[in-house]
């Protein structure tokens, strides 16, 4: 198959949600995308064929994302937009206000998915990272059940189509499922060949909760300050990419691996050429998938180190090291 055909695959690759609706398989991640870069990145992605844009209030670039959407000329109804509730708005009365702020910044009437970004609460109020006189973060005891029930009420407003979660461990996931009238449609988490989380992924498949993978290129983002070689330089991915022919990159292989596993995937870039080159779906063979699955490196890069307690104990590589907000 040619690059052109792989790009066509990417445009046509969707996952079906339990109600029959579809979520695009490859989206654009925007964490740490600067305000001056975001609009052009979003516009370039949509013009290249992406139909899935991921953002969050804490990223501070929702206004620019909205501008990029409008500048692209792609109809709003053709685009899946995900955003996330930040930790300082977990109180029930603040959840709808936080959504309104996101909609105002995006200049959209609705978003497709709204996720709880992290399962713990910071002090309610205008400060995104409230600190005491010692410089320590100030947390607030807001039960996740309260926040989830407030999220459920958003569905009645027509301003959000689906609700979900991000960075939840088994404990928080099970607490939500125990009281949910509407269970999460999506769980966004760190997933890549260095952190496949196969057992946790299978649990979500059984629950019919779609998993969306952030940081699919693992330690490509310099914010992770990784002490191991970059995933996209790993010999296994390089060899598969080379065997696939000119124009295929190790990043394409990592992204296609994620899609083949049944997860939507959110590679981040502000470089137009990389945005375009990332948007390929290569149906990997069972042999190629097995080779990637057997890489043997296990490393989590997003530990939520700013959380009040370790977030991923009991999950693959749950020892805190780095922070991802």
Curated annotation (Swiss-Prot):
**Pfam short name (any one):** Aldo_ket_red
Segment forming the signal sequence: none
Q: What EC number(s) does the entry state?
A: 1.-.-.-
Question: A GO CC term?
Answer: nucleus
> InterPro entries under this entry?
AKR, Aldo/ket_reductase_CS, NADP_OxRdtase_dom, NADP_OxRdtase_dom_sf
Provide the site residues for: Lowers pKa of active site Tyr. 84
Compartmental location: Cytoplasm; Nucleus
Please give the biological process terms from Gene Ontology that the record holds: cellular detoxification of aldehyde
User: Which cysteine residues pair off into disulfide bonds?
Assistant: none
Keywords attached to this entry: Cytoplasm, Nucleus, Oxidoreductase
Give the residues annotated as active site: 59 (proton donor)
Q: Where does substrate bind?
A: 117
GO molecular function, a single term: aldose reductase (NADPH) activity
User: So what family is this one in?
Assistant: Belongs to the aldo/keto reductase family.
This protein is called: Uncharacterized oxidoreductase C8E4.04
């Amino acid at each position: 198959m040619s690059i052109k055909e792989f790009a066509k695959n990417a445009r046509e690759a969707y996952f079906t949600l339990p109600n029959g609706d579809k979520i695009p398989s490859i989206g654009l991640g925007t964490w740490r995308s600067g305000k001056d870069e975001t609009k052009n990145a979003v516009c370039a992605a949509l013009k290249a064929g992406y139909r899935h844009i991921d953002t969050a209030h804490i990223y501070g670039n929702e206004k620019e994302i909205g501008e990029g959407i409008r500048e692209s000329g792609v109809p709003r109804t053709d685009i899946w937009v995900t955003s996330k509730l930040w930790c300082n708005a977990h109180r029930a009365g603040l959840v709808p206000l936080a959504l309104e702020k996101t909609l105002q910044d995006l200049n959209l009437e609705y978003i497709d998915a709204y996720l709880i970004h992290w399962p713990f609460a910071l002090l309610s109020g205008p400060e995104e990272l409230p600190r005491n006189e010692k410089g320590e973060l100030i947390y607030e005891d807001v039960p996740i059940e309260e926040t989830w029930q407030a999220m459920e009420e958003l569905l009645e407003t027509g301003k959000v189509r689906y609700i979900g979660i991000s960075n939840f461990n088994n404990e928080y996931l099970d607490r939500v499922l125990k009281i949910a009238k509407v269970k999460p449609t999506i769980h966004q988490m760190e997933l890549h060949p260095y952190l496949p989380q196969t057992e946790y992924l299978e649990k979500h498949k059984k629950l019919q909760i779609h998993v969306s993978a952030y940081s699919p290129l693992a330690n490509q983002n310099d914010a992770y300050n990784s002490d191991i070689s970059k995933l996209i330089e790993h010999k296994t991915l390089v060899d598969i990419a080379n065997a696939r022919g000119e124009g295929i990159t190790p990043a394409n292989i990592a992204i296609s691996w994620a899609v083949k596993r049944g997860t939507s995937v959110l590679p981040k870039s502000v470089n137009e050429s990389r945005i375009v080159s990332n948007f390929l779906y290569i149906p990997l063979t069972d042999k190629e998938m097995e080779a990637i699955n057997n890489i043997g490196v296990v490393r989590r890069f997003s530990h939520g180190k700013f959380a009040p307690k370790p977030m991923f104990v009991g999950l693959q590589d749950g020892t805190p090291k780095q922070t991802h907000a």
